[in-house]
Amino acid sequence: MFHFSGFNMMFPEGRNFHANYKCFSVSMLPGNERTDVEKGGKIIMPPSALDTLTRLNVEYPMLFKLTNVKKSRSSHAGVLEFVADEGKCYLPHWMMENLLLGEGDILNIESVSLPVATFSKFQPHSTDFLDITNPKAVLENALRNFACLTRGDVIAIKYNKKVYELCVLETKPGNAVSIIECDMNVEFEAPVGYKDHSETQASGSGQQGAAGTVGGEIAGATNAILEEVVETFKGSGVRLDGKKKKESQLETPVVKKVLARGVPDYDFQFGLIRFDRNIRPISDRSQEDDAVAGNADASDAESFHGTGFSMKKTRK
């Protein structure tokens, strides 16, 4: 049996990476503006970190645990580039808010190995997220710029020039998971501030039923019904997405038309169809026809009062 101890010395097993850096937001990065870093969940580290990671034989993909020791807050992220100044690292703004970090604070970075994600659940922080037609497709496209997810983090995604914040409520199989080349099921919780109006609609239908019974009891008061003024659509409108409607102040107020309630037919028999028409008796119709004919004869008799003449004289 042969032992290759020298082989193991040439290729040592991977060890963890530990380092402390001064953290800054991406807006402080020298050079051109890096909007792509703000859209994702990856950080920028100095070149010396790459040399150390290579010598330690760290597993790929490179994932890191970020810890703010003073505030006891931690999160996870991937690395985008190794172009930062020595002793500094640059983070997205939303990640610094999660870790309660300020510009120049000390951040502890440690290399970790995370399980591949199988399930995650998100909760939007605004009801405006309901305006998105296909939220799963938008989230899938945004998560391409992320390397991992941590339970409890509030991530920020940008869509149609608007930033949406989502809280990571649940991740499986662990509290922190890798989302690189994974097949992950996604669910959404109701947004913060969203109210379900099904109960209010049910109570409104109950009030309408009660109003119908009361109307049957006062059916005999015809005079009161004629004088009663009805105002249609007294309730307030409700949006399907749960947001409040925008109140627009008009310069000239809209005058509502007042409609008077009509008198119902209380002698109506169920199953009987009536076609009411203005039908005149036959005797009245015949008298009118005779009168019209007499007037026509009289007008014919009174016509041509003069004598007639012939163009051709008759021979005697």
Curated annotation (Swiss-Prot):
GO cellular component term of the entry, any: VCP-NPL4-UFD1 AAA ATPase complex
Record Gene3D superfamilies: 3.10.330.10, Ubiquitin fusion degradation protein UFD1, N-terminal domain
Superkingdom field: Eukaryota
One annotated GO biological process: negative regulation of smoothened signaling pathway
Keywords: Ubl conjugation pathway
Record flagged with keyword Transferase: no
Gene Ontology molecular functions: polyubiquitin modification-dependent protein binding; ubiquitin protein ligase binding
Positions of region (Disordered): 284-316
Family: Belongs to the UFD1 family.
Biological function: Functions at a post-ubiquitation step in the ubiquitin fusion degradation (UFD) pathway.
Record's protein name: Ubiquitin fusion degradation protein 1 homolog
